[in-house]
Regions:
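Intracellular terminal tails of multi-pass secondary transporters
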Residues: 1-66, 79, 89, 233-268, ...
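Helix-to-loop junctions at the C-terminal end of transmembrane segments
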Residues: 105-118, 337-351
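Structural signature of the two symmetry-related core transmembrane helices
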Residues: 121-135, 354-369
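Helix-breaking motifs and short loop linkers at transmembrane-helix boundaries and internal kinks
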Residues: 69, 85-86, 109, 117-118, ...
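Extracytoplasmic gate region of multi-pass secondary transporters
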Residues: 74-75, 277-343, 406, 410, ...
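Conserved MFS/SLC helix-loop-helix module at the cytosolic interface between two early adjacent transmembrane helices
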Residues: 105-144
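Extracytoplasmic
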Residues: 54-89, 110, 195-199, 297, ...
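Glycine-rich segments within core transmembrane alpha-helices of 12-TM secondary carriers
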Residues: 178-210, 219-225, 427-441
Length: 501
């Protein structure tokens, strides 16, 4: 074997184990077999490729379940759903609210359970449960039954998004994460966009077998989700230190390299033994609350679009119900472009704060376009068409911006938090505040304000001005901390750690 003296990795496990900065034991290796720098880089590239294909693919599909419910409910809202279930007044918003509350309550224990149970059985079980409950929604007869089913839906899906965010963050180095979160978001929004097309087709089955169109949406997509849940058991991968438990994934050498490269990046590949004290102590970190508030602000906007876009297009832009479902699709397909592009730039140049700020400004511009009154009276069809086109274009800009910021915020958080339980706790906490944003977002779109939707527009604009302020505050704080680190201060109990901004 040729010797490249740049970087060597030893692969024979020692009988001894080192203790990392968090107190957890980490496997060390002796000099029985060395890898040169070129061989190391080749293995790293191979591991990334395999992990992208196995983990990011299934994680993207499962993350789309976050939007599956909103896509079906949004599409159903312009069909006979309201009259069939007597969803009068604020009952539609309550159905969103109660779903979110159930999800918030169970997010922390469900995220911790990923470690207890293991990713494969855990995600397979909750995905199958989510699909089964979605299928059962097709047969509810009253709004009260709808509320009860949506509580169960919220519980079932509470562990999906924060759990997957946590799992993905354990497999990639900090500079690789934003693009991988972009893959997740791309799969999520592409599935939502495709779901609108599927919902359009299923709505055409209205009356078949005695079922309304919206019931067909829940029935078919619930069945598909159950199948995905079964497949997940074999497709999903375990944590890096347990990679050998995954079906047909990494070789023994690749598994060791996967562990070693994460350990070299941030020194927390193996978690401490679980204690609730080690989870709850992380709530003393003020960064957790800053990240949580930013997710809250972002989800105010995303909920308004995810659950209400067909209604906004129907009432605000005066299209038919089926046209509204179809026209809800293009903004989400478009969103794949900015999220992948900005995330590629973020990982390439190690940028986080500037991209979050840029995306927030784009969202503000999109909402102002959407809420813009006619510049001139629409006394001609040409003027009216231009105004509709301007407002519809605003939905593209806003959708692309908020989807891009999901990936950027995930990477921003994961890059600046060290420790397995701390990252699990932070992921669950921000997901809970994300859910609180859903509650707020479900009430800012008011049909009586059509076509301008002033409350939705100005709440979204204000939330993202505040987000920019928090990012600036974090950037200054991280800069000062990194300067102290250069002077010898150890950050987050990890030698060599520096904040990313």
């Amino acid at each position: 074997m040729s010797q490249d003296h740049g970087h060597q990795l030893t692969l024979e496990k020692s009988a001894s184990e080192a203790i990392n900065s968090n107190g957890a034991s980490t496997p060390q290796y002796n000099d029985e077999e060395d890898l040169s720098t070129s061989e190391w880089k080749h293995l790293e590239s191979k591991i990334r490729r395999k992990t992208d294909l196995r983990l990011c693919s299934i994680a993207g599909i499962l993350c789309s379940l976050n939007l599956l419910d909103s896509g079906i409910l949004a599409s159903a809202s312009v069909t006979s759903l309201f009259s069939d279930l007597d969803l009068q007044g604020q009952r539609y918003s309550v159905s969103i609210f109660i779903f979110t509350v159930a999800s918030i309550v169970f997010q922390l224990p469900c995220t911790v359970a990923v470690r207890w149970v293991g990713p494969r059985p855990w995600f397979a079980s909750i995905t199958f449960a989510f699909g089964l409950i979605t299928l059962c929604t097709a047969f509810v007869q009253t709004w009260r039954q709808m509320i009860a089913v949506r509580i169960l839906l919220g519980i079932a899906m509470s562990g999906i998004y924060p759990g997957l965010t946590y799992l993905v963050s354990t497999w990639y180095t900090r500079r690789e994460q934003q693009l991988r979160f972009a893959f997740l978001q791309s799969g999520e929004v592409a599935a939502l966009a495709t779901g609108y097309i599927v919902n359009y087709g299923l709505n055409l089955l209205d009356g078949r077998a005695g079922l309304e169109g919206w019931r067909w949406m829940y029935l078919v997509q619930g069945l598909i989700t159950c199948v995905i849940g079964i497949v997940t058991y074999w497709w999903m991968v375990d944590f890096p230190e347990n990679a050998q438990k995954s079906f047909f994934f990494l070789s023994e050498t690749e598994a060791k390299v996967a562990v070693q490269r994460i350990q070299a990046d941030r020194g927390d590949v193996v978690p401490d033994p679980f204690e609730w004290r080690k989870v709850l102590v992380n709530f003393k970190d003020p960064k957790l609350y800053g990240f949580a508030v930013m997710y809250f602000l972002l989800n105010i906007t995303s909920t308004a679009l995810n659950y209400f876009l067909p209604q906004i297009i129907e009432s605000g832009l005066e299209f038919s119900s089926n046209e509204s479902i179809l026209l809800s699709t293009p903004p989400y397909y478009y969103a794949v472009l900015p999220v992948v592009l900005t995330s590629f730039l973020g990982d390439t140049f190690n940028l986080r704060s500037p991209l979050i700020t840029f995306n927030a400004l784009c969202l503000i511009a999109g909402y102002l376009m959407f809420g813009a009154p006619p510049v001139v009276p629409s006394n001609t069809s040409n003027n009216g068409s231009r105004h509709v086109a301007l407002r519809y274009a605003g939905t593209f800009l806003a959708t692309g911006a908020y989807v891009s910021n999901w990936a950027a915020l995930n990477a921003y958080m994961a890059n600046n938090v060290v420790g397995q339980w701390k990252r699990a706790t932070t992921a669950a906490a921000v997901a809970a505040c994300n859910g609180l944003g859903s509650i707020a977002g479900s009430y800012i779109v008011r049909n009586q304000e059509a076509p301008g939707y002033a409350t939705a527009v100005w709440a979204s604009v204000g939330s993202h001005i505040l987000m920019i302020g928090i990012v600036i505050f974090f950037t200054i704080g991280f800069y000062v901390q990194n300067k102290n680190q250069k002077g010898g201060k150890v950050l987050q109990n990890t030698v060599g750690f520096r904040y990313t901004y």
